[in-house]
């Protein structure tokens, strides 16, 4: 099977200026995920999709190619999914398509290999990196001025012991993988059979602020 990886990184980040090239322990943020993708040795081609020359310059010495991200896909309101689906129309066809976000620097080559193995064995249509939600979701309630309404039935049944409460997960944001033809047809990573690769909380850091950078550096050390 042939595999394409894309790392989308627009230049116009708002909360943290130049986020994708902000140093994390002296290394531009985008290099962390780029190195992991390359070290996995899974992909026939790795593309950096960016509208910013500085972002590509930060990884230009690595075995990557550049896709110039169109202006309409580089705005604050643009979605990564739309940008990736359009990019698939512009490049040659592969068997699988994956994209990785530079804001999640602690993904390992082994995480990527686990996801790709699921696709190659045709266990599913798509694979998404997942992490456990630390809060006990089943204790959630909706509140109004007049009432407190449990979201889940367990509170009505008096079940609050964590031993009897299910674990909930969410996308970690690090990567999305899928079979090429499936994505071309559905343009959605959740439309078919989806499997997850669980990323532990200590490696599920999503960097959007300086505080996130400092937290990430504290974890490394």
Which stretches of residues belong to each language-model region?
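Catalytic donor-sugar/metal-binding loop of nucleotide-sugar-dependent glycosyltransferases
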Residues: 185-205, 210-214, 218-221
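Short phosphate-binding loop-to-helix
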Residues: 47, 53-98, 106-114
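Conserved core of the sugar-phosphate nucleotidyltransferase
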Residues: 82, 105-193, 198-199
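Short, high-confidence coil segments that cap the C-terminus of an alpha-helix
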Residues: 43, 92-94, 123-124
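Histidine-centered beta-alpha loop that forms part of the nucleotide-sugar donor binding/catalytic region
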Residues: 10, 71, 131-132
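N-terminal glycine-rich phosphate-binding loop and ensuing alpha1 helix
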Residues: 2-49
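Short, structured coil segments at secondary-structure junctions
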Residues: 42, 61-63, 144
């Amino acid at each position: 099977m042939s595999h394409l990886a894309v790392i989308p990184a627009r230049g116009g980040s708002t909360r943290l200026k130049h986020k994708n090239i902000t140093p994390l322990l002296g290394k531009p943020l985008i290099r962390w995920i780029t190195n992991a993708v390359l070290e996995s040795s899974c992909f026939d081609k790795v593309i950096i999709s960016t509208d910013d020359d500085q972002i590509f310059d930060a990884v230009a010495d690595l075995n990557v190619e550049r896709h110039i991200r169109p202006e309409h896909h580089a705005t604050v309101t643009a979605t990564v999914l739309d940008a990736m689906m359009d990019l698939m129309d512009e490049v040659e066809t592969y068997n699988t398509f994956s994209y990785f976000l530079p804001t999640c620097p602690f993904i390992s080559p082994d995480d990527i290999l686990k996801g790709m193995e699921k696709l190659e064995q045709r266990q599913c249509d798509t694979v998404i990196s997942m992490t456990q939600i630390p809060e006990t979701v089943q204790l959630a309630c909706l509140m109004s001025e007049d009432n407190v309404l449990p979201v889940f039935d367990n509170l009505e049944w008096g079940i609050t012991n964590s031993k009897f409460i299910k674990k909930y997960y969410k996308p970690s944001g690090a990567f999305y993988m899928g079979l090429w033809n499936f994505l071309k047809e559905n343009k959605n990573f959740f439309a078919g059979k989806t499997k997850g690769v669980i990323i532990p909380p200590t490696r599920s850091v999503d960097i959007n602020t300086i505080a996130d950078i400092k937290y990430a550096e504290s974890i490394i050390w």
